[in-house]
Regions:
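Catalytic-site signature of metal-activated, phosphate-bearing donor transferases
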Residues: 11-18, 24, 28, 35-197
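Cofactor-binding loops of NAD(P)H-dependent oxidoreductases
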Residues: 4, 28-30
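Short, acidic/glycine-rich phosphate-metal binding loop used to engage nucleotide
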Residues: 2-9, 14
Length: 199
């Protein structure tokens, strides 16, 4: 176990990657599970790999139930990589792999148990919106007072209508609403941070 100071999700993952001594690395978070089908697909691919990075469809869960709408599935993420061919962005939150090599895709899902209940959903929403606002502040981004409600409305429309959340019942509505509210608070917090650095 390696313990370090916390500088954001991207930097932490890149630090972890620097300790890998194998040819390939699979990055998964503590709330993610490799499905048996994905495991089989990865092992088969690694016998004769054609690419240096592979992405997989992440199946997000809300209160224990899979949500296949509102942009939550397929939520593709690059997670399997040949060490040295890619690195993680230095984003505080919503980090991603940066690479210029060829990439491939798996069809089997990575299971993401992101929200065990509504309490954990609200806690995570608050934490992620704070980190995203801090990232916007670090990049010197400034926004007007109408930005939070307008971005929130667009995000809800995008998730609920354009990405099919309306076909997912209460789970589809909840997933769409969670995305919209996170966007709203991200921009509210960014505006507040720009006015008051202590916030």
């Amino acid at each position: 176990v390696v313990e370090t100071d916390w500088l954001g999700y991207g930097i932490q993952k890149q630090r972890a990657l620097s300790f890998v001594e194998t040819t390939w690395a699979l990055s998964i978070d503590c709330d993610e599970v490799v499905s048996q089908a994905l495991k089989d697909e990865i092992l088969l691919t690694l016998k004769h790999p054609c690419h240096n990075v592979y992405r997989m469809p992440r199946l997000n869960h809300l209160c224990g139930r899979p949500v296949r709408c509102a942009g939550w599935y397929p939520d593709y993420v690059d997670r399997l990589l040949r060490v040295g061919e890619a690195q993680f962005s230095d984003s505080l939150v919503h980090e991603s792999l940066v690479f210029s090599c060829s990439s491939g895709s798996f069809s089997s899902p990575l299971l993401h148990y992101s929200y065990d209940d509504l309490d954990s959903a609200i806690d995570k929403l608050n934490r992620y919106s704070s980190l995203a606002a801090m990232s916007l502040k670090q990049r010197g981004r400034r926004f007007g007072r109408l930005t939070p409600p307008l971005r929130m409305c667009y995000r809800f429309f995008y998730a609920y209508v354009l990405r099919g959340g309306c076909f997912g019942g209460l789970d589809g509505f909840s997933a769409s609403l969670l995305q919209a509210v996170e966007v709203y608070f991200k921009y509210c917090k960014a505006i507040r941070k720009a006015r008051d650095p202590i916030f």
